């Protein structure tokens, strides 16, 4: 803490002749080889999940996210900070994730075998205890412009450092050129399970007018 009399005191400031500041030069384009590895994992997935956060909103990458998710046909969820990045009325949208999120989003997150995280932090409100969330058989792909955010809370199998808008666009381009397609039978079974979780209608409550709620 700094005493109030110090913060309100007036003084003469000697300006330096020059100022040298280390600038921040983020990597914008994702590594092509890493993107290729990520797509290979996504093609082999039996229970895929796409988990997006506020980085998609800040990166103005909603259009790129929608194009990529729809091309795959995989389920997608947003964190609180990522709401609005994907249309809430889209059938592939699972609702918000985390302690205040939907049952189906949280169950799919916990049971997926390949997880693509885009502009998200793996916050404790989303994954709970990292030790319990981590599973050897679950493969995690993490896209983020900040390299310090990758493998910060959970171990990541395929890190991709880059601007989410650029990376998602490149992933879509590479996806369209692939001869391999998602496992249709496995994906159908996965969506069947998701619909069972969704059928619980977790946000529903008794709307009787007898009691003010």
Go through the PLM ranges and name each one.
Residues 8-15, 60-64, 87-92, 126-130, ...:
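Short acidic, glycine/serine/threonine-rich loops at helix termini
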Residues 2, 14, 20, 40, ...:
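Phosphate/pyrophosphate-binding active-site segments
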Residues 2-7, 54-56, 122, 147:
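Glycine-rich beta-alpha junction loops
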Residues 1-41:
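Conformationally flexible catalytic loops at phosphate/diphosphate-handling active centers
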């Amino acid at each position: 803490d700094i005493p109030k009399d110090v913060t309100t005191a007036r003084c003469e400031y000697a300006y330096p002749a020059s100022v040298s500041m280390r600038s921040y030069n983020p990597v914008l384009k994702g590594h092509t080889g890493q993107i290729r590895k990520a797509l290979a994992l996504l093609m082999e997935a039996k229970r895929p999940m796409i988990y997006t956060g506020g980085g998609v909103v800040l990166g103005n990458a909603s259009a790129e996210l929608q194009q990529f998710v729809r091309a795959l046909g995989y389920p997608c969820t947003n964190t609180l900070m990522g709401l609005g990045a994907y249309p809430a009325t889209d059938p592939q949208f699972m609702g918000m994730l985390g302690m205040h999120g939907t049952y189906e989003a949280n169950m799919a997150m916990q049971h997926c075998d390949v997880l693509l995280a885009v502009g998200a932090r793996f916050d404790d409100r989303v994954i709970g205890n990292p030790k319990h969330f981590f599973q050897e058989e679950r493969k995690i792909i993490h896209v983020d412009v900040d390299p310090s955010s990758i493998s910060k809370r959970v171990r990541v199998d395929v890190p991709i450092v880059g601007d989410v808008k650029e990376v998602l666009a490149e992933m879509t381009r590479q996806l369209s050129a692939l001869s391999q397609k998602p496992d249709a039978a496995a994906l159908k079974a996965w969506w069947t399970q998701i619909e069972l979780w969704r059928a619980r209608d977790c946000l529903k409550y008794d709307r009787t007018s007898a009691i003010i709620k």
